[in-house]
């Protein structure tokens, strides 16, 4: 694991030095990314707080969709892939359905999605060197459980969005420290 991470870093550094004309704006935004992360997570939490009560009141199920195994994937070697897949899952499957459940929350769900898209964009710009080829079994389990819940899956997934934000934070904190 450590040797492959070192190899990725060396490849990245070689690529950075070998590519003349790279804009400093991108480099600067990446160096500021760790400092901006708490602000981006706060924006996600603020946006979620506007719809949290609605979805948690509608979520009548006792089971947990975002289990500890997902957090373990976030913290493990599949962290990049698990995060990428979960962001895609929320943006493409959960939020489009969530927007259609009540016209009063549509704008707030849309705002939450825009904040998540902003985070994804920053991650892609600054963390492209992370290995993201393998599929996460925990993400597949989340998607399968979501599908089985049918309409109730939207309430479950949206009511647990704060857990997803916490997992993002755990993943990014770990990556920033390394």
Curated annotation (Swiss-Prot):
One of its GO terms (cellular component) is extracellular space. The keyword DNA repair does not apply. The keyword Signal applies. InterPro entries: 4_helix_cytokine-like_core (IPR009079), IL-10 (IPR000098), IL-10/19/20/24/26 (IPR020443), IL-10_CS (IPR020423). GO terms for molecular function: cytokine activity. SMART domains: IL10. Disulfide bonds join 30-126, 80-132. It comes from the Eukaryota. Glycans are attached at residue 134. Residues 1-18 form the signal peptide. Its main location: secreted. Keywords: Cytokine, Disulfide bond, Glycoprotein, Secreted, Signal. PROSITE patterns: INTERLEUKIN_10. It is found in: Secreted. GO terms for biological process: immune response; negative regulation of B cell proliferation; negative regulation of cytokine production involved in immune response; negative regulation of inflammatory response; negative regulation of interleukin-6 production; negative regulation of membrane protein ectodomain proteolysis; positive regulation of B cell apoptotic process; positive regulation of cytokine production. Major immune regulatory cytokine that acts on many cells of the immune system where it has profound anti-inflammatory functions, limiting excessive tissue disruption caused by inflammation. Mechanistically, IL10 binds to its heterotetrameric receptor comprising IL10RA and IL10RB leading to JAK1 and STAT2-mediated phosphorylation of STAT3. In turn, STAT3 translocates to the nucleus where it drives expression of anti-inflammatory mediators. Homodimer. Interacts with IL10RA and IL10RB. Belongs to the IL-10 family. PANTHER family: INTERLEUKIN-10 (PTHR48482:SF5), INTERLEUKIN-19-RELATED (PTHR48482). This is Interleukin-10.
